Swiss-Prot record:
Protein name, UniProt field: Large ribosomal subunit protein bL32c
Upper taxonomic lineage: Eukaryota, Viridiplantae, Streptophyta, Embryophyta, Marchantiophyta
UniProt keywords, alphabetically: Chloroplast, Plastid, Ribonucleoprotein, Ribosomal protein
GO annotations of cellular component type: chloroplast; large ribosomal subunit
MF-aspect GO terms: structural constituent of ribosome
Amino acid sequence: MAVPKKRTSKSKTRIRKAIWKNKANKSALRAFSLAKSILTNRSKSFYYTINDKLLNSSKSISTSKLDES
């Protein structure tokens, strides 16, 4: 069975962990940006279907929020 010859240093471990976390953070930001563009109807590269029931309910919610202000 293959076993590493020497122990990995703390700094190398931290560097690898930071790279892994940065990749996860980047993909999360990309997904959040796509979600924001879809919600604000500014998406140009993402196609989706609109359900009439959801569309009508969202309009009533948005107008009720404006009335409360």
